[in-house]
Structure formats: C-alpha cells, structure tokens
Amino acid sequence: MSDKSYQPTIAGLRAFVAVVEKGHFSAAASFLGVRQSTLSQALAALESGLGVQLIERSTRRVFVTTQGRHLLPRAQAAIEAMDAFTAAAAGESDPLRGGMRLGLIPTVAPYVLPTMLTGLTHRLPTLTLRVVEDQTEHLLTALREGALDAAMIALPVETAGIAEIPIYDEDFVLALPPGHPLSGKRRVPTTALAQLPLLLLDEGHCLRDQTLDICRKSGVQAELANTRAASLATAVQCVTGGLGVTLLPQSAAPVESVRSKLGLAQFAAPCPGRRIGLAFRSASGRSASYRQIAKIIGELISTEHHVRLVA
C-alpha cells in the first residue's frame, strides 16, 4: 500500500529511469556514476514509498512491470522539469542540457539531416544529438515510452499526450520516368494521377497515406503499380526504371533527381503537400527548449530547401 504522504526523490526517479533505459542495474549505476547498491536502495525506496513494483529483477536483465511502463513517461518528465529548473536557476544558456534523442521519419531524415547536423553543431555546439530513423507509429511509441525526447514527423499526429510544434510546409512533386511527356510541366492537375501507375511506399509510411489521401480528395481511383518500396530511394529507382510514378516531398526532389536522372513535374494550385513539425511529450518540462530547437531547424532547412516556414 502506498504512503499518501510520500514524495519521490529525484535520485529515486533517476534510478528507475536509468535501469529501464540501460536494461541492467550495473549499466544504470555506471551511467549515473553511483554504486550499484546505492542505485538499488534508491529504486527500492521509490517502490516502497509508491507501494508499486516498477521493475522485475532477474540475474540477466530487468523487466518493466505494467505499472512501471505506465509511470515511466511521468518519471522522465519530472526529471526533465527538474533539470530545466536547475539549468534556469544557474543561468544556463544551453537549450537542452544533457542532450536530445531525436527521431525522424524516413522521408525526412536523408534529405534534411546534412543541413541540420552541420547547422546545429555550429549554432548549438554543446548540444549532444542522437538520431533515430523510423516510421511515424514507431517514433510515437518511442516518445510515449520515453525512448525519444522529440521526433520530426508529418503533422498533425492527434495523439493523446503528444504536443506538436509546426516547423515548415512543403509541396509534393510528381516523379516520372526519364522522357515522360509530363516531365517539366508546372501545372499538372492531381486528377492526372488517375491515368498513371502510382507506386507507393510500404504500409506504415505516412507518405503512402498522404498520397492515397490526395487521390481521394481529387476523386481519383488510383491505378496502383504492382511494385511497392520500403524506402523513397528504392521507389525512385523503380520510377526511373519505368515501373510507375510516385510523389516526392520537395525537399527530396533535388537529391533523388540528380541520383537517378528522374523526370519531375509540379502540380497545379492548390498544390498538395505536407507539414513537418516537432512532436514531444506534452508533460515534458522542456517545451520552451524544443520550440527554440524547432525554430533553429526551420531556419537551417529553409536556407537549403524550397520549404515554407510556419510562423
């Protein structure tokens, strides 16, 4: 039974989060710079005070209980808030103390990371960034479970407990085989997709859903090509080989067209597109820092890519 007067300590919360993230008591103790016995005592005190078992102990590894998994994001948010409070009190100028675990979707990462990483290193030299590329659903799960701090994904996500910061809007362009009659056109109606074999990414990619949504809104019954691709780069190679056409985000077009001698066409207004932004846990104490990071990312990307910053 929990003690209603009990107040968890930051040491206990740090012990809990570290054990979950590192998967072993010894690794967690090393990460926190404390003895394993000290860490075990802090975690045991936390569980005793809460009246809840957070971790199942094993000689080989640890397992997070259902209650522990439910409470993990709140523990992480409390630690983040305390770190932000301490940093502010000390006059800390770094926007993110202790680094940032950033997720990106596969149709964003390869095209903006070179600009982002170089620019962030220059603008925020003390920022420690760890990058993870994955599909939207997996990134949102990682956010909810505390495995990521933030993620660059297509908005809106409309997921409980997740906050969004819009960064930029970008158009889609039509990728065509070399020499295609539509190549170079600037006002292709979206209804033209009805006469073209449309090549889609695998299920789970948000670009696939966005492409099908564009077809639905245009009243188009798309003729789907028999080929599906796991990545945008593979889709482009298939288009170059004459297996169909596909939609590309504007930020990806320069890279992919140079690689593959791809034909490109622009859609007629209103041009279909997407909004990219930064998602993070709404309970996080770092929302102001994430807004600063999002602003810098937008400024960096807009200098290299044809995107429109969201005010």
From Swiss-Prot:
Transmembrane segments: none annotated. Residues 8-65 form the HTH lysR-type domain. It holds the Pfam family LysR_substrate. GO terms for cellular component: protein-DNA complex. Keywords: Activator, DNA-binding, Transcription, Transcription regulation. Residues 25-44 bind DNA. InterPro entries: LysR_subst-bd (IPR005119), Tscrpt_reg_HTH_LysR (IPR000847), WH-like_DNA-bd_sf (IPR036388), WH_DNA-bd_sf (IPR036390). GO terms for molecular function: DNA binding; DNA-binding transcription factor activity. PANTHER family: HYDROGEN PEROXIDE-INDUCIBLE GENES ACTIVATOR, TRANSCRIPTIONAL DUAL REGULATOR HCAR-RELATED. Belongs to the LysR transcriptional regulatory family. This is Probable hydrogen peroxide-inducible genes activator. The lineage of its organism: Bacteria, Bacillati, Actinomycetota, Actinomycetes, Mycobacteriales.
